[in-house]
């Protein structure tokens, strides 16, 4: 899985090899183009997978194109890994506050951050079959691993090591998602930094971490790392955290984060 390793998202361990073989199989061979598709879906994240499977279940001829990891952010670098880490952080926080409920916790109880991240990778690998190329093929979707581009108003060209194909379509669904932009901060590139994607490749807890951006992702990661003991700085250009949310709700979150 050399191209996946280079992305910095997946450390080379057994669980991530299982994940990669499900969502970006190295020996995948793209099927022959099957005439004119009712719909070609670009991107196999949450939106793309749902579009493809609903179309196929209704009897449509569907092609699904993915150049990176099937499952998108949710499986690989979003919902699944973040909630695993957050759950572990909450368990640790509950344990530390257990005495206020009359529970006696033995002195010297510790957590293992490496084990927390290993559990996350194991859970992610275990459920990755649900978003795999083979499963969607079995469900009647033609899966193409490679980069797709519009060659005309009715064709998409797929290029990649799994085989180049030209796909004709009646409709196309663009489900390519988004990616966080890196702020233009002098020296940031030279200093090195994590993103909401690469942070889940950590194996050791950082002693100090600055989180730039206080949206939902920034806040949940900041709270999790703080609960594990990192000294966390949250930096937000706008007024307050969760600026797009109800202010009363955002203040409740802010107060809890400050306690953590």
Model-predicted regions and their roles:
Residues 2-37, 50-60, 65-205, 238-242, ...:
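Glycine-rich flavin
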Residues 36-39, 231:
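A general secondary-structure boundary signal
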Residues 42-43, 94:
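Generic signature of intrinsically disordered, low-complexity, basic-rich segments
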Residues 43-46, 67-68, 212-215:
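Glycine-rich Rossmann-fold phosphate-binding loop(s) that bind the pyrophosphate
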């Amino acid at each position: 899985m050399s191209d996946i390793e280079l992305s910095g998202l997946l450390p080379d361990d057994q669980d991530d090899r299982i994940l990669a073989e499900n969502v970006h199989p190295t020996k995948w061979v793209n099927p022959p183009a099957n005439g004119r598709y009712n719909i070609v879906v670009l991107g196999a994240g949450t939106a793309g997978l749902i579009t493809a499977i609903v179309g196929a279940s209704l009897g449509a001829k569907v092609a699904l194109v993915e150049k990176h990891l099937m499952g998108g952010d949710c499986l690989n670098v979003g919902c699944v890994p973040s909630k695993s880490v957050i759950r572990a952080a909450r368990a640790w926080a509950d344990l530390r506050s257990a005495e206020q409920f009359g529970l006696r916790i033995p002195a010297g109880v510790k957590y293992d951050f490496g084990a927390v991240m290993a559990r996350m990778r194991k859970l992610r690998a275990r459920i990755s079959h649900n978003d795999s190329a083979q499963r969607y093929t079995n469900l009647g979707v033609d899966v193409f691993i490679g980069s797709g581009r519009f060659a005309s108003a009715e064709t998409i060209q797929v290029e990649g090591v799994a085989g180049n194909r030209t796909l004709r379509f009646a409709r196309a669904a663009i489900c390519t998602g988004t990616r966080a932009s890196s702020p233009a901060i002098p020296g940031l590139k030279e200093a090195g930094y994590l993103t909401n994607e690469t942070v889940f490749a950590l194996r050791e807890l950082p002693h100090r971490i600055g989180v730039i951006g206080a949206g939902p992702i920034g806040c949940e990661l900041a709270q999790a790392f703080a609960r594990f003991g990192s000294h966390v700085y949250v930096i937000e250009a706008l007024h307050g955290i969760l600026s797009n949310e109800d202010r009363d709700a955002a203040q409740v979150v802010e107060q809890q984060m400050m306690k953590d």
